[in-house]
C-alpha cells in the first residue's frame, strides 16, 4: 500500500516532464507576422537576382509557397513557432484575392448599384390573380384569335419588315412579332369601321398603329409606348370591338353576362373620352346590320343604378376607373368570368397614383387567361419590368424614347417671378387664338386663375379633383365645343385627354415630375399639327427638376434659356454611362437630368412609406392614437 502511494508522485512527475517536452510556446500574432516576413525575405535573398525591376514586381505579387507538413521543419529551420506561422492568415488571403480580382471602375460600380436598385424596385408581387398564384398557374402561350393578316403580309420577308420598322422609327422587342400593316384595309376590319375612320380624317395608320394593331389583333400581350397624340387609343379600341363582335356572333350574350373586354383608365375624363370613341364605331356597325354591342362606362361620381341596368341586360365592353370597378366586382354586381381582354391605359400613371392594389383586386376576379395590354407615353424601365410579370411572351412596341416630348410641340420656357405670373399669363394668352389650356399643380391656384380670368372678361372654365362629376363633364364639353376659350386644370386633365384644336398649352408652374410635364405639353401638337407650350419657371423649382427639363429640351432640339444653360450639370457627358447601362437618365421616373441613385421621386416615395409605417405603429390619431 505504501509502495503504491509512493509510486504515484513519481508517475505524476513523469507525466509533467512529458507535457513539458510537448509544450509549444504561444507566439503572438504580431511576432508571427514578423517571422513570416523574415522568412519571405530570406527566401527572396536565396533566389537569383531577377533580370528587371518589372519581373521583380511580378514575383513579389505571387502568393507565398505552401507551408511545409506539420512534422517537417520550415525553411527557416526554426522550431514549432515557425511551423505555426507557415499557414497564411485570412488577411493575407483577402489581399491576394483582391489583387487577383479584375479592377472595377467607378462607372461599373455605379451601374451595378443602379441594377440592384431597379431589381429591388421591380421585385413586387406579380400582377396575377390570387388563384393563379396559389395554384402556381402560369401561361406559356398567348391566346389564339381567329384573325390572320393577308397572305402577302404573312409572306413578307423579315428583312423587309425590319426595313419598314426602321423607316417608321418603330422599335420592337419580342418573339415572332407579326409584320407591320401600312393600310387599314390589311387589318380586315368591317367596312363600317373603315368608313368611320375615313370620316374622321384618318386615312393612314400612325407608326404605333402600323405595328401595334397587327400585334393586338393576333392575340399577343403588348406594351405600347409612343408620344402623346400618336393614336394609341385606336390600337386597343379597334381590336376590342372586333373581340366583342366575334363573341356576340358566335354565341349571343344573355342578361347578366359579360364583359368580354375591359379598359381601365386613371381618370374619369379619360374613361369618358375612350367610351365616346368606342361608341363612334359601334353606331355605324349597328346601322349596317351587325349585332348590337353594348358598352358600359363605369366611373365614380355617377349614379350606380344606371350602370347596373346596363349590366343586367348583358354588357360586352367596360371602360372603367379602378375605384368604381372594384366596387361593382366586390358587390358581385358584375363578374369577369368571360373577360379575355384587358387594357391598362396610361399604365404607369395607374401605378404611380396608388391604384396598384385596386388593379390587383381586379385581377383576382379573372377566371382564365386573358390578353393584357399596357399603353402610355411615359413608361419607365421599372414599370416595364414590373408589367412583364403579368404578360405572356409580350411584344414591346416603342415609337421614340419612353418619356420623350412630342417633336411637334414648340417648347418655350420663361423665367417669371412668383408674383408676376398672373399678369404674364394674360400676355401669353395673346400669342395664339383660342382654345388655350392652362395647367397648375394646386387646386387653389386653379380657382384663383379661373376667377381672375373671369374678372378680366375671358371665357374660362376650370376642372380639378375637388369639383363634382357634373361640373367636370360640363367644363370639358363647353371647352371642346368652343363655347369657352380657356380651360384651367390640374394634372387630372393632362393624361390622355384629346383636344384636337388646341394650339397653346401654358404651364402656370413647372410640375415636380418631368413625366407630368410631358403629359401636359402633349395636349397640343396632336395628329401631326404644330403646337406651342409655354412654361413658367422660377426659384421655387428644384435643381433636379430644372436639369430634367434642360435635357428634355436638348433632346427635342429646342431653345434652352440662359437660366437653364447656366446650371451645373453633373450628367453633361453621360454617354458612356448610358451606353454601358442601356438606360438613358433615370430608370425610375424617366428624367434625363439625374440617375436613379439621385431620383427625388424615389426619395419622396421612400419618405412617404416610412411616414406610413410610423403612422401604423403609433396609431392613426384621435385620443392616444386609438382611431
UniProtKB/Swiss-Prot annotation:
Enzyme class: hydrolase
Protein name stated in the entry: DEAD-box ATP-dependent RNA helicase 35A
Listed EC numbers: 3.6.4.13
Pfam families (alphabetical): DEAD (PF00270), Helicase_C (PF00271)
Domain Helicase C-terminal: 408-568
Record family assignment: Belongs to the DEAD box helicase family. DDX41 subfamily.
Motif stretch (Q motif): 182-210
Residue ranges constituting the Helicase ATP-binding domain according to the UniProt record: 213-397
Record keyword Coiled coil present: no
Example GO molecular function: ATP binding
Gene3D superfamilies the UniProt entry points to: P-loop containing nucleotide triphosphate hydrolases
Amino acid at each position: 500500500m505504501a509502495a503504491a502511494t509512493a509510486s504515484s508522485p513519481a508517475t505524476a512527475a513523469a507525466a509533467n516532464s512529458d507535457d513539458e517536452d510537448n509544450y509549444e510556446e504561444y507566439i503572438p500574432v504580431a511576432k508571427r507576422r514578423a517571422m513570416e516576413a523574415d522568412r519571405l525575405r530570406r527566401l527572396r535573398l536565396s533566389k537569383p537576382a531577377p533580370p528587371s525591376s518589372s519581373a521583380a514586381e511580378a514575383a513579389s505579387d505571387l502568393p507565398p509557397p505552401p507551408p511545409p507538413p506539420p512534422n517537417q521543419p520550415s525553411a527557416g529551420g526554426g522550431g514549432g513557432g515557425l511551423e505555426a506561422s507557415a499557414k497564411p492568415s485570412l488577411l493575407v488571403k483577402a489581399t491576394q484575392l483582391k489583387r487577383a480580382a479584375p479592377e472595377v471602375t467607378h462607372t461599373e460600380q455605379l451601374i451595378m448599384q443602379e441594377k440592384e436598385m431597379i431589381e429591388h424596385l421591380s421585385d413586387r408581387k406579380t400582377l396575377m390573380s390570387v388563384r393563379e398564384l396559389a395554384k402556381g398557374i402560369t401561361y406559356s402561350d398567348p391566346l389564339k384569335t381567329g384573325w390572320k393578316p393577308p397572305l402577302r403580309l404573312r409572306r413578307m420577308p423579315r428583312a423587309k419588315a425590319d426595313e419598314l420598322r426602321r423607316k417608321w422609327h418603330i422599335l420592337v422587342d419580342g418573339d415572332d412579332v407579326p409584320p407591320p400593316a401600312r393600310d387599314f384595309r390589311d387589318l380586315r376590319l368591317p367596312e363600317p369601321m373603315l368608313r368611320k375612320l375615313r370620316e374622321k380624317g384618318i386615312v393612314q395608320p400612325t407608326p404605333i398603329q402600323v405595328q401595334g394593331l397587327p400585334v393586338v389583333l393576333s392575340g399577343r400581350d403588348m406594351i405600347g409606348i409612343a408620344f402623346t397624340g400618336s393614336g394609341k387609343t385606336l390600337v386597343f379600341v379597334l381590336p376590342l370591338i372586333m373581340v366583342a363582335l366575334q363573341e356576340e356572333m358566335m354565341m349571343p350574350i344573355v342578361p347578366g353576362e359579360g364583359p368580354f373586354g375591359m379598359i381601365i383608365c386613371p381618370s374619369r375624363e379619360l374613361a369618358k373620352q375612350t367610351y365616346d370613341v368606342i361608341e363612334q364605331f359601334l353606331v355605324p356597325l349597328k346601322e349596317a346590320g351587325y349585332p348590337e354591342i353594348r358598352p358600359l362606362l363605369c366611373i365614380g361620381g355617377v349614379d350606380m343604378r344606371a350602370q347596373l341596368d346596363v349590366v343586367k341586360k348583358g354588357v360586352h365592353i367596360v371602360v372603367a376607373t379602378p375605384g368604381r370597378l372594384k366596387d361593382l366586382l366586390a358587390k358581385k354586381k358584375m363578374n369577369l368570368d368571360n373577360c379575355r381582354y384587358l387594357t391598362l391605359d396610361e399604365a404607369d400613371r395607374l401605378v404611380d397614383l396608388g391604384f396598384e392594389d385596386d388593379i390587383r383586386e381586379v385581377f383576382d376576379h379573372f377566371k382564365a387567361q386573358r390578353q393584357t395590354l399596357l399603353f402610355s407615353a411615359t413608361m419607365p424601365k421599372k414599370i416595364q419590368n414590373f408589367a412583364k410579370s403579368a404578360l405572356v411572351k409580350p411584344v414591346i412596341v416603342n415609337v421614340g424614347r419612353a418619356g420623350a416630348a412630342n417633336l411637334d410641340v414648340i417648347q418655350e420656357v420663361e423665367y417669371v417671378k412668383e408674383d408676376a405670373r398672373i399678369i404674364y399669363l394674360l400676355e401669353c394668352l395673346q400669342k395664339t387664338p383660342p382654345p388655350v389650356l392652362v395647367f397648375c399643380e394646386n387646386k387653389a391656384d386653379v380657382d384663383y386663375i379661373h376667377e381672375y380670368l373671369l374678372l378680366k372678361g375671358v371665357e374660362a372654365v376650370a376642372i380639378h379633383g375637388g369639383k363634382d362629376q357634373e361640373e367636370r363633364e360640363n367644363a370639358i364639353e363647353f371647352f371642346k365645343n368652343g363655347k369657352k376659350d380657356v380651360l384651367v386644370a390640374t394634372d387630372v386633365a393632362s393624361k390622355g385627354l384629346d383636344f384636337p384644336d388646341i394650339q397653346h398649352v401654358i404651364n402656370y408652374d413647372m410640375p415636380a415630375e418631368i413625366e407630368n410635364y410631358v403629359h401636359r405639353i402633349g395636349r397640343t401638337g396632336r395628329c401631326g399639327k404644330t403646337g406651342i407650350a409655354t412654361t413658367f419657371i422660377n426659384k421655387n423649382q428644384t435643381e433636379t427638376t430644372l436639369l430634367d427639363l434642360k435635357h428634355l429640351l436638348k433632346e427635342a432640339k429646342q431653345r434652352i434659356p440662359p437660366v437653364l444653360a447656366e446650371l451645373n450639370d453633373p450628367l453633361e457627358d453621360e454617354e458612356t454611362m448610358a451606353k454601358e447601362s442601356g438606360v438613358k437618365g433615370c430608370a425610375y421616373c424617366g428624367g434625363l437630368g439625374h440617375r436613379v441613385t439621385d431620383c427625388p421621386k424615389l426619395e419622396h416615395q421612400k419618405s412617404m412609406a416610412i411616414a406610413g409605417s410610423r403612422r401604423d405603429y403609433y396609431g392613426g390619431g384621435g385620443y392616444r392614437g386609438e382611431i
